[in-house]
């Protein structure tokens, strides 16, 4: 499997989540020192992660805005330390070009933009400048759709075209349907059922639903975040079967066997 110029063994891969934030919904505050972050990265790599997704600002509903300066202070030391110690691809989870540039300079390989270039109009130019793969996630302000799966597909197709127009090569573009972002539980469920349509857009698809509210709803409600890892793994299997190629998860080990087996059947 290729992500732009980068080659990953197999036809599917796990992206391990590293939140260096104090307020992420699942693990906020757990990895706010470089050493704690490195220890977690080492474990995720041992468990089978092929990409580490570093985020310095929580994107959960109601989270506090973080300036680019503060975000850079959080992510750059961690990215540098990971690159100094491990041979692993790093994605930077940010929608700010200033942070993205600093992360790329520090050694990050991939851009992961939860606003698909809408928040910062220079993100695509930056991706083109660095020949960096970019993941474009569906997002919007309100939970209003005519038909959620079609609307998501239209959005992703339009944003991918905007990236192409800005000089980003097609093989550097990935898409993410954005589970949990501006979507009700019902809308997330409908989107899950239509996931194969997203996978038919012509771009590789990242699947990120780990520990989110829709997983809790599918389990009947009232579960804690870390109690959703088994269901997350089941949904990873479902997504890979629909055609997704990367699963973004908190618990790498719970997903590794699924990815290892299904990767050989894709």
Swiss-Prot record:
Binding site for (7,8-dihydropterin-6-yl)methyl diphosphate: 59, 93, 112, 176, 212, 248-250
A molecular function (GO) term: metal ion binding
Reactions the enzyme catalyzes: (7,8-dihydropterin-6-yl)methyl diphosphate + 4-aminobenzoate = 7,8-dihydropteroate + diphosphate
Gene Ontology cellular-component terms listed: cytosol
Pathway(s) of this molecule: Cofactor biosynthesis; tetrahydrofolate biosynthesis; 7,8-dihydrofolate from 2-amino-4-hydroxy-6-hydroxymethyl-7,8-dihydropteridine diphosphate and 4-aminobenzoate: step 1/2
Keyword Transferase: yes
Key word Transferase present: yes
Domain named Pterin-binding: residues: 12-260
Subunit and partners: Homodimer or homotrimer.
NCBIfam families in alphabetical order: DHPS
Protein name according to UniProt: Dihydropteroate synthase
């Amino acid at each position: 499997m290729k992500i732009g110029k980068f080659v990953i063994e197999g036809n599917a891969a796990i992206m391990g989540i590293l939140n260096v934030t104090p307020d992420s919904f699942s693990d906020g505050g757990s990895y706010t020192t470089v050493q704690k972050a490195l220890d977690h990265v080492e474990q995720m790599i041992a468990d089978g992660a092929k990409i580490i997704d570093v985020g310095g600002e929580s994107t959960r509903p109601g989270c506090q805005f973080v300036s680019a300066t503060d975000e850079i202070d959080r992510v750059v030391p961690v990215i540098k330390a990971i690159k100094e110690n491990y041979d692993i691809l790093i994605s930077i989870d940010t929608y700010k070009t200033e942070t993205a540039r600093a992360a790329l300079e520090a050694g990050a390989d991939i851009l992961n933009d939860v606003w698909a270039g809408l928040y910062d109009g220079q993100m695509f130019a930056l991706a083109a400048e660095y020949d960096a793969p970019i993941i474009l996630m569906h997002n919007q302000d309100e939970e209003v759709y005519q038909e959620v799966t079609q609307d998501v597909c239209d959005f992703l197709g339009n944003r991918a075209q905007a990236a192409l127009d800005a000089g980003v090569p097609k093989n550097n573009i990935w898409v993410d349907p954005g589970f949990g972002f501006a979507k009700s539980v019902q809308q997330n469920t409908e989107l899950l059922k239509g996931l194969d349509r997203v996978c038919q857009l012509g771009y590789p698809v990242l699947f990120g639903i780990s520990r989110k509210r829709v997983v809790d709803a599918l389990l009947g409600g009232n579960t804690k975040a870390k109690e959703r890892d088994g269901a997350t793994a089941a949904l990873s299997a479902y997504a890979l079967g629909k055609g997704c190629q990367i699963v973004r998860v908190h618990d790498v080990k719970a997903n590794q066997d699924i990815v290892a087996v299904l990767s050989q059947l894709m």
